[in-house]
Amino acid sequence: MALLGDIVIYIIMAFVVIGAVAAIRDDERGMGKEFLEGLHSIGPIFIPVAGIMASIPYLSRFIEWAIGPIFGLIGASPAMAGTTIIAVDMGGYQLAQATAGDTANWIMAAIVGYMAGATIVFSIPVGLAMLDRRDHKYMALGIMSGILTVPIGVLITTSILSITGANVRDEVSTTADSTFSMSALGFGTILTNLIPLVIIVVAIALGLYFYADAMIKGFMGFGKIMDTGIKLVLAFSIVEYFTGFFSTVLGGWGFDPIIADAQDQFRALEIAGYIGIVLAGAFPMVYAIRTYLARPLSVVGRRVGMSVEGSAGVLAAAANILALYHLVRTIPPKDKVLCIAFAVCSAFLLGDHLAFTANFQPNMILPLMLGKLGAGLIAMVVAAWIAVPKALELERQDREQGVIGVDEYLAVGGLGAGQQESVEELAVGEQKGTDNPDSDPQRSGR
């Protein structure tokens, strides 16, 4: 496991150098552009990381008092509650250690944070901010479909760690020896810890199947509230850091610092920075794969019923969900849902999460990659069954209302035969002089 981690890191570091040289020659295209975008991603990553990590003292109390006891009644570790909603690289790793009670449960809780937590605190608020409003409903369908396979991804990764007896670090460190054997994590503990997650995903599945419209509205409301809270906490933390205003006026400040201090060397700014400097190599690496393997990727995409844009979206998500969000507008609605469903568990596979794991738990790289990838692929199958029919219905409505242009996405194979015929009928109607000003493609967008 350690050897694989070293190999991956050295490959990424080679692309850091290649990307830097390319940026010197031309920083507006190719690997040079990808190198700089990796570094520039530190900012977007820092916003939610800082907001969540600063809130950890209050989130910890909320989890310990409100959610943890519910998990405990089932027999699951309270640490699982925290990483269900907080990403591992946004404070979930440290929070899980503080609430787990032992290393085995800490590591399992951290794995949940790579999938469920990353989605709740990062992918959702950032997606709502980056995507066109017309794409929010497709994002909701994709997210809710992808959440259903989180227990599968956690089961795959923890099973590999347990069976192989992989050694992990038993403290938050980038330099400590890996001395704790994960063979201590038994299958009984794994299954017990997964019970709350299974209950949550079953509830989501039932809601998505029977009340899709209400679930979409609830999802978007939740994301907006979270995004607002994160930005306010970050703003207040910045004011407090430079002025001490809140400590002076209120007599105390319960939030954690967002910049390293004597108490903790891995605060929000440092973690975002660690991730960004690794992405400076990961992004050029993915660019090379996407460029030089474009033909086989398109062949694979066609065989599974996806457009070339959709196939590129899947690969982009594997590096960083920001890269996927950048492409979403060009991807047909059906493939938007499939890509985002894949991204719930598999996003950051070759980017942020690879970087974080390589820094803090290098022996977990292979089991984590297999778990995330397996769950992501299964999520696409689930989404095709439970969410794509609704997505096609919404696409038809968007076309009729002019939100999506009549010819938009047709060139990339986003429609089935039935939708193709319907769109042709709309186009014929327009050619005959149908008075429908809302069908103007120029009016689509936010």
Predicted regions mapped to residue ranges:
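Alpha-helical membrane segments and immediately flanking helix-loop junctions
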Residues: 74-149, 307-361
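Long, well-ordered mid-to-C-terminal structural blocks that present hydrophobic/aromatic surfaces
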Residues: 247-309, 313-322
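Alpha-helical transmembrane-segment detector that highlights a single hydrophobic TM helix
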Residues: 63-84, 259-268
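Juxtamembrane/interfacial segments flanking transmembrane helices
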Residues: 27-31, 63, 289-296
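Short amphipathic alpha-helical coupling elements at transmembrane boundaries
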Residues: 33-41, 68-73, 224, 295-306
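Hydrophobic alpha-helical transmembrane segments
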Residues: 53-61, 83-96, 128-129, 169-179, ...
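Transmembrane alpha-helix boundary signature
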Residues: 55-65, 95-103, 160-163
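Signature of multi-pass transmembrane helix bundles
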Residues: 1-51, 108-113, 123-281, 358, ...
